[in-house]
Amino acid sequence: MSNHEKMSTTDLMENLREELTCFICLDYFSSPVTTECGHSFCLMCLLKSWEEHNTPLSCPECWRTLGAPHFQANERLGRLANIGRQLRSQVLQSEDEQSICGRMPGPSWVFSDDEQSVINVSPPSQGTNKACFSSEAEEQHKEKLQDIINILRKKKKEVQAILNHEKERVMLCKEETKTCKQVVVSEYMKMHQFLKEEEQLQLQLLEREEKANMKKLRENEIQLTQQIRRLGKMIGRIESTCQNLTLESFEEVKGAMDRYESLLFQSPETTITELSLCHITGMREMLRKFSTDITLDPATANAYLLLSEDLKSVRYGGTRQQLPDNPERFDQSATVLGAQIFTCGRHYWEVEVGKKTEWEVGICKDSVNRKGNLPKPPGDLFSLIGLKIGDDYSLWVSSPLKGQHVREPVHKVGVFLDYDSGHIAFYNATDESLIYSFPPTPFHEALRPIFSPCLPNEGTNTDPLIICHI
């Protein structure tokens, strides 16, 4: 048999041994059993492994969690393991016999003095009578093999210890994950409770403001009704006097005029009602997750608008620029669109309006009409308009156009779009309050941000609109 054939036999035996070896004890199977995941182990090895590790039952090889200590005896695998053990023993014995003097052809070898190499001791002229290993060389050979075995056994113990440690870490990891889940659930329960309490406080505030507004409306209604009644009496008396006009009646009318003079100068007024903007705790932190980098699209900007180099701000310039009248450009409205086009997802951005007395920000269809200054059809534009006249400040949403008086100006506006759910909302980004939320509207085409710094209003509205970095 050639050296190549010997090596092939050794390799085959090693491969067979690996297939018939228990994963736990690394020896041939003894009374093997197979778990429900398909892996096989010695019966005693498997039971001992489950006993040593106080964890949910799992496969020692793939760590799959087992529903119950269920396994099947694998008698065929046991018989194969016995055959493999016997076959390996015979092959090793045969190789040992071939190494005995006179039976193995070729030269004989012994260890050199430094034990690092072997030397040929056969006389060149000898035929089949060869020198044998000396007993001293044989002992050295066995000692070296025993040293290797000891090293391998030590290494096996180290690997087994690491494996046992890793199995313990599996349970520890599960416990840590379970604890973290409990903490998350607990913290979110606290947050839910806190938000529920905040919700109740906001509702109570709105109810109080509603009562105050209703009281003002009723009081004004009573005053207007009384004024109408007094005016009616005055009209009736004057009409009666006109029908029977005498000197005495004229004097009576003159006296009545003096008495009702204050009534004539009373101007009827409508009641101003106010509602607080709905403060939402943690609103900005939640919306920041959907922040989108918005820039302006110069191709859509009205010729009177001046855009910054970084395309993050726009103001009214006062002088018409020489720009091409392309189809995308607004020719009458002081408007510019954002460069981003949305067809899905959630998006949030903020716009600094500062101390401007008039402005408009929002979202529109990409197909919105850019020519002329006609009102946009409902569904084409979703915008928020800020307007300050004297000391009165109001916010308007479009379209349809709805107004709301507010106590304080808004300096920074947050715009939120959830395309998939058809939701658009505006927020006061400074105090984290909701300004207005449009009813859900299904979107069927692309949407874009829209901005208008509006006209300068004799120099009182020259500040720019600035898209903020979130």
Curated annotation (Swiss-Prot):
Q: State the Gene3D superfamilies in the record.
A: 2.60.120.920, Zinc/RING finger domain, C3HC4 (zinc finger)
User: Looking at the keywords, is Cell membrane present?
Assistant: no
* Gene name of the record: Triml1
The EC designation for this entry is 2.3.2.27
What species does this protein belong to?
Mus musculus (Mouse)
Q: Which terms in the Gene Ontology molecular function aspect does this entry carry?
A: transferase activity; zinc ion binding
Record's SMART domains? PRY, RING, SPRY
Q: Which residues form a coiled coil?
A: 135-170, 196-235
Enumerate the spans annotated as B30.2/SPRY domain: 273-470
Please report the name of this protein according to its UniProt entry. Probable E3 ubiquitin-protein ligase TRIML1
